[in-house]
Amino acid sequence: WTDVKDAMEIYNFNGKHYEIVNSVSAEAVVIYNKQTISEQGLDDPWELYQAGEWNWDTFEKMLEQYCDPDADQWGLDGFWAEKALFLSAGVPSVQSVDGRLKTNLNDATVEKAMNFGYDLYNKGLVMDRSLFDWNEQPQFMGEGKELFYICGAFAVQSNPDTWNTKIPVENLGLAPVPSPEGSDPYQGATLDGWVLCKGAANPEGVALFADCTRLANTNDEAIAIADQKMKDDYQWTEELIAINKEINDLARQYPVVDLATGVSTDVASLTTDGGDQIGLRAAYHGVEWATNREEISDVVDMLVQEVDDQLAALA
């Protein structure tokens, strides 16, 4: 359980842990077309990562070099992109600190992340989805008309004929979501696990079952079976499998989860799920953060404090 200990702390409230985390994976990855990268004379993102040079700056420079809407060359796409890049700075809007809920809307790192998104928008590096009935256009990736598509790896974990990106399997590229230069490589994380309900009739059975699921994620034979499935069903190469594992390892080492959605739908609607005009996605659609923050921070602080008080009362 050692490598999921940090992830378990994310759901630590008042000194009690509320999720038995059996695995951690990256919530999103950067998907790219190797052929597009090569034809444009750009550096391969995975190779930049290996060289320690994959960060917000190199990500932005590549978008600047590629983007040309007049030539039907679009930059950043994906409904997951805004949240993924926000979390890659390392500070979510709501988190548990020493067992208590804390809001971070006035944190300098959050401001930095929002300003980064606003800058990408102002430079025309974020695909204008209003031109496409407000839909993402992942198929542009396979057509060489889009540089980066940020989504969960699940988008390319099926028969390649079903991939919405339409990237030929031999040209599929994956990289972690970049973080600020000089920062740890934080990744938005998916925590797979179990919750033991109060009054459960067989808590020892739950513990044993959790051990079994943990074993399935760490046993060499089980991992080999999963790897073979990726080769057979997804046509992934050994290299792609290794890259995906390394990205998930980053999520285990540097996991970031925003608790806003779990606090309440009201908090989520003002932060992670706020849409294009308010909250954490709005900067990527031209909404300046200082104004946005002023509108939501007091209300979010109040709503989160109410829930934190309720958790404290339960303890």
What are the roles of these predicted feature ranges?
Residues G52-T58, D128-E143:
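Short helix-initiation/N-cap motifs at beta->coil->alpha
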Residues E9-V30, S38, N55-K102:
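Extracytoplasmic/periplasmic solute-binding protein
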Residues W163-Y234:
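Extracytoplasmic/periplasmic substrate-recognition and gating elements
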Residues T36-D44, G199-V206:
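Short helix-loop capping/hinge motifs at secondary-structure junctions, enriched
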